[in-house]
Curated annotation (Swiss-Prot):
Subcellular location field: Cytoplasm
Enzyme nomenclature, EC number: 2.7.4.3
Name this polypeptide is given: Adenylate kinase
Keyword Lipoprotein: no
Region of interest called LID, as start-end residue ranges on this chain: 122-159
Family annotation (InterPro entries): Adenyl_kin_sub, Adenylat/UMP-CMP_kin, Adenylat_kinase_CS, Adenylate_kinase_lid-dom, P-loop_NTPase
Originating gene: adk
UniProt keyword list: ATP-binding, Cytoplasm, Kinase, Nucleotide biosynthesis, Nucleotide-binding, Transferase
Amino acid sequence: MRIMLLGAPGAGKGTQAQFIMEKYGIPQISTGDMLRAAVKAGTPLGLEAKKVMDAGQLVSDELIIGLVKERVAQDDCAKGFLLDGFPRTIPQADAMAAGGIAIDHVVEIDVPDEEIVKRMGGRRVHPGSGRVYHIVFNQPKVEGKDDVTGEDLAIRPDDEEATVRKRLDIYHEQTKPLVEYYGAVAAKGEATYNKFDGTQSVAKVSEEIVAALS
C-alpha cells in the first residue's frame, strides 16, 4: 500500500496522515524528517546532503530520490509507505518513477482556499504555553484571552491572511501540474487517484479514504 498524500496547508492532511499510518501500519515518509535522519545517521547520502545544506544550498532532486529509495528499502516499509509533501514537482515525480518508486494510490484532500483562510486566520495562540484556540471552532472563554492564565492571545505570523494566501498560491502553482500528472498515471491504470472533500468531518473523510483504498 504505497500512498501519496496531497493537500494544501490547513486542509487537514496531518490528521489523515496519522489515521492512514495507524490503520494500515505503514510509516509516513516526509522528506524533511528523512533528511534529518540521514544526516544524523551519517549515511553517505546524509553526509552529502549535510554538505549542501551547510553551504546554504537546496538539496538536489537526485539526492532526495536517493534518500527516498534508501528509506523505502527499510524493513518498516515492507507493507508500504505514505509519502507526504513529495514529490512537489514533475521532475521529481519523473525521477521517482525512473528510480522504480511506484505509487499505488494518490489521495488528495481538497478544501477551498476561503475555507483554509478562515481555518488558519482564525487561529489564536497563547505564546507562553503554546495552547491553541480558534475564534470559530474552539473559542476561549474570554475573547482574546488564554483560559488558564488570562493572558493575551496572539496570531502567529504563519496564520496571517496574507501569509496563508501566499502559501496557497505557491501550493496551487506547484500542485496543479502534479494533479494532472497523476491523473494521467491513474488513467493508464497504474494507480488510483481519489479526491476527498476536506470540508467534511474528520471521521467522514477517514471513512471515505478507507472505502476508496479497500
